[in-house]
Amino acid sequence: MANVVVIGAQWGDEGKGKITDLLSRSADVVVRYQGGVNAGHTIVVKDKVLKLHLIPSGILYPDTICLIGSGTVIDPKIMLSELDMLVENQIDISRLQLASTAHVTMPYHRLLDQAMEQRRGNNRIGTTGRGIGPTYSDKSERIGIRVIDILNEDKLRTRLADPLRQKNNILEKIYAISPLDFEEIIKEYIEYGNRLAPHVVDCTRVIHQAARARKNILFEGAQGTLLDLDHGTYPYVTSSHPVSGGACIGAGVGPTLIDRVIGVAKAYTTRVGEGPFPTELEGSLNDHLCSRGKEFGTTTGRRRRCGWFDGVIGRYAVDVNGLDCLAITKLDVLDELEEIKVCVAYELNNERIDYFTSNVEDFSKCKPIFETLPGWQSSTSDCRSLEELPEKAMMYLKFLAELMEVPIAIVSIGPNRDQTIIVEDPIHGPKRALLAA
């Protein structure tokens, strides 16, 4: 039995969906512990591309229970559309369970998110505009609406009255936006609640029962380490905790329940939205990575910013999350390059530093110090073992393992399930006995 957390080791979009999908084969329960529809993951199964935002990747396995935990925020309209899409693809959704204590994104959250971002002008954060930040803000202010509230009309009326009055006041007086109708919201969200009711459970209790029965539990994070509210490039961050510690809070478990933490990182780096990005590329190289890697957001469709692999933020992710091993994705995107650079340190104020600075003003001044490695200039997409990889591709992976000071357990060389090299079973294999330098 092993309980595993999967996290993003960069700024999100690392390919966690594919890795979680693969690991879900060994999991009895998969738990999404934070975030909302601001995160998306793409899974390719038998030439079908499934784009999910809220539903855990494990839903594709017929014997896996999928939980959406208390640390998430739910947009019921989008969640129901995803469930409908899964049903259309003959996927059983009866195994999906939703925490009664998860908070719900309301119409005013989306309006406020978009209005506040527009008002920031040149200081915008790069929010998806899906209402995630305002939903978490109401949760902290203890005026939020939870899933359990939309299951009962009388309760929803009581819970919604004061918050809607406040939000309409802000929308009208500050942003000149027409107020929202109380009765329309009640009608809409009670309908959502009626449809979601069969899936609503005491999520924490379900997890504890699974743990006592010695089931394999997989905790699935959204976004990435550098987007964490406390440990990321604040204020250019999300409103929740994608780091491994967030799994304990968002799922309601103690840290001793976690056996392993697996970090997912691309073989290069990407970022969506605003904020400093030391290894960011421009021109033809940026275009090449974006085109080859299909670097457009699942949620917003925005083009991702692309850059070389950053070992400094990588080591930071190892430390913050307590990573046991890595999954390196999109190695194949680098196949055609003559040479590949890796950031091993920064230059800040004419001094070399090898650590991530949480001061965003200083971080924005950091200049990458690179080491250059030879490219392999041959296809890796058909490789199914380390021995089949080009020698220079192996050199690159070993360099990353040494730089990050953790072993590599999985290498992904394409979007399909079978385009994966399992170096060692990251769940049941020997700890820290995988691909290292």
From Swiss-Prot:
Gene3D superfamilies: Adenylosuccinate Synthetase, subunit A, domain 1, Adenylosuccinate Synthetase, subunit A, domain 2, Adenylosuccinate Synthetase, subunit A, domain 3
EC number(s) given by UniProt: 6.3.4.4
Active site: D13 (proton acceptor), H41 (proton donor)
Binding site for IMP: D13, E14, G15, K16, N38, A39, G40, H41, T128, R142, Q223, T238, R302
Enzyme class: ligase
InterPro entries referenced in this protein's UniProt entry, alphabetically: Adenylosuccin_syn_GTP-bd, Adenylosuccin_syn_Lys_AS, Adenylosuccinate_synth_dom1, Adenylosuccinate_synth_dom2, Adenylosuccinate_synth_dom3, Adenylosuccinate_synthetase, P-loop_NTPase
Protein name: Adenylosuccinate synthetase, organellar chromatophore
Organism placement in taxonomy: Eukaryota, Sar, Rhizaria, Cercozoa, Imbricatea
